[in-house]
From Swiss-Prot:
Transmembrane portions of the chain: none
Organism: Staphylococcus haemolyticus (strain JCSC1435)
Gene name as annotated: rpsR
Taxonomic placement: Bacteria, Bacillati, Bacillota, Bacilli, Bacillales
Protein name as it appears in the record: Small ribosomal subunit protein bS18
Domain of life: Bacteria
A Pfam family matched in the record: Ribosomal_S18
């Protein structure tokens, strides 16, 4: 068997950050908020990692892309 035995454990359900905090609009100028949802390499983190709902993931993606276009966020980050 590849991978070894499976461990039984219940994972805690991830809660959407925006729903929990009552945020209805994601502003592309709020770079500190957007940086929470970007990997150290500059990629947008997926929903399964962050727990963001589909509605807010779409808004988040649009805001990050706008911030990148306006040079508020980098497209990629250096290795060093």
């Amino acid at each position: 068997m590849a991978g070894g035995p499976r461990r039984g454990g219940r994972r805690r359900k991830k809660v959407c950050y925006f729903t929990a905090n009552g945020i209805t609009h994601i502003d592309y100028k709020d770079t500190e908020l957007l940086k929470r949802f970007i990997s150290e390499r500059g990629k947008i983190l997926p929903r399964r990692v962050t727990g963001t709902s589909a509605k807010y993931q779409r808004m988040l993606t649009t805001a990050i892309k706008r911030a990148r276009h306006m040079a508020l966020l980098p497209y990629v980050k250096d290795e060093n």
